[in-house]
């Protein structure tokens, strides 16, 4: 597995409005809303490719296909994504992680916004994504 860089970090927000008050209003981070979503994010914070505030309901939908986080699964507090070279490398990395004993939450798939990602829950309770986001690979 060849991880190229940390693609993104997001806090998981059970209460997105309160989290927005902290990260946008109090800290002054330049987070923008995603259309039709409570997800706030920025690609313009120095030292970070992507930082987001991800509503728990949207994280549950992305991982389990339901807005409710399963009661028998540790509720995550954050998500970190590691970028690989291409969509095929996401599948390969997910297979390697599974072979090493780490059960995926879901296999590699393309999200509606064009990112290919496979996710698992870490022993620490983080959502860990192996991803390929085409916009991170475009020539400057």
Language-model features: locations:
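N-terminal beta-strand motif that seeds the catalytic metal site of vicinal oxygen chelate
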Residues: 1-20, 77-82, 133-140
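Core segments of cupin and vicinal oxygen chelate
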Residues: 10-60
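Short connector loops at helix/strand junctions that flank enzyme active sites
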Residues: 4, 46-48, 73-77
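Vicinal oxygen chelate
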Residues: 2, 42, 94-140
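Mid-chain, well-packed structural core segment of small domains
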Residues: 74-94
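Short hydrophobic/aromatic beta-strand element in the GNAT-like acyltransferase core
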Residues: 40-41, 50, 81, 117-119
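Short, flexible, mixed-charge acidic loops at enzyme active sites
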Residues: 56-71
């Amino acid at each position: 597995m060849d991880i190229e860089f940390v693609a993104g970090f997001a806090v998981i927000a059970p209460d997105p409005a309160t989290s927005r008050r902290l990260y946008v209003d109090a800290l002054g981070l330049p987070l923008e809303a995603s259309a039709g979503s409570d997800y706030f994010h920025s690609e313009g914070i120095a030292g970070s490719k992507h930082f987001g505030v991800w509503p728990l309901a949207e994280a549950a939908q992305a991982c389990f296909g339901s807005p409710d986080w399963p009661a028998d699964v540790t509720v995550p507090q954050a998500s970190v994504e590691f970028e690989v070279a291409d969509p095929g490398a996401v599948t390969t990395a997910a297979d390697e992680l599974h072979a090493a004993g780490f059960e995926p939450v879901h296999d590699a798939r393309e999200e509606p916004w064009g990112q290919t990602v496979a996710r698992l829950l870490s022993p620490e309770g983080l959502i860990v994504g192996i991803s390929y986001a085409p916009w991170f690979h475009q020539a400057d």
